[in-house]
Amino acid sequence: AKELGCTNTHFANPHGLQDENHYTTAHDMALIAQAAYQNETFRIIIGTKMYTIPPTNKHAEETVLRNHHDMLCTYHNANRKYLYPYCVGGKTGYTATANSTLVTYAEKDGMTLICVVMNTQSPNQFIDTVNLFDYAFDNFQVLNVAENDTDYRAETTVDNGNLNNIAPFVELDKEAVIVLPKTAEFSDTSSSVEYNDSDPEIAGSITYTYAGRNVGKADIKTTGVVVEGYAFDNESTEEEEQEAVSTVQVKPKRKW
C-alpha cells in the first residue's frame, strides 16, 4: 500500500473485519483498487455475477457463489433498482463499526472510473455511487495524448556536417490519456517533462496538469529506429572533422 502512495492505511488482517489497527481512507482504497484493476484475473473475478464450483472430494454437491454487488447483479436486487449499465465490477463490505462500504468500477466512453463509498447505511452506498458516476461521466472526458498534443515534437537528428537526417526515433505512448472537464480543451493543460536514463524503452515522460491538479501522464517511448551518419569527405581539416552524432530531442513549444 505504501508503494502505491497510500498515506493513511494500515492492515492488521487479510479479511477486513474490525480491528482498531485496521484502517484506510477512500483515497487510499481508490489507489489500491486502481492497482488491482491492472490484473486481468482480478478484473474477471470482480465482474463475475455467479460462479459454480463443481463437486469435490470434500463437498459432494455443487457450490454456487453469487456476487452481492447490486449495481452489477440481482442476487439482493430482485427489482433491479440499483443495476447500473456501466458497472463492470466491485466489492461490497460491512461491519457493525464501519457500516456499509463499497468499491465500484464503471466504464463508459473509453473512461474507467473507481468510486469508493464508506460509512453509510444501506442502500445509500449504491445510490451515492450511481450519483457520483453519473456526475463524472456527464462532466468529464478522456483525451488521447498522442492524438491531441501538438506541442511536443520528438525526432532524431544525425549531423556530420553534410547530412541532416531526421527520423522518428521516439514517440508518445499511443495509449496514454488524460481526463479533463468537458468544458476544457487539451491546450488548457500545463505540462512538464522528466527524462529517464534507466529504461532503454522509455526516454522520459510528460506529466499534464489542469487547474493545479494532475490529470495524466504519457511516456516518451523509443521506437527502435537506428539512424547512422556517414562522412562524405575523405579529406577534411581538423575543424571540419566531426563524428556522426545521434541525439534524441523533445522540443516543447509550450511554456510552463
Annotate each predicted stretch with a short phrase.
Residues 6-7, 21-23, 27-28, 33-256:
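Domain-terminus/edge residues, biased toward the C-terminal soluble/receptor-binding domains
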Residues 14-20:
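Conserved short loop/turn motifs at secondary-structure junctions
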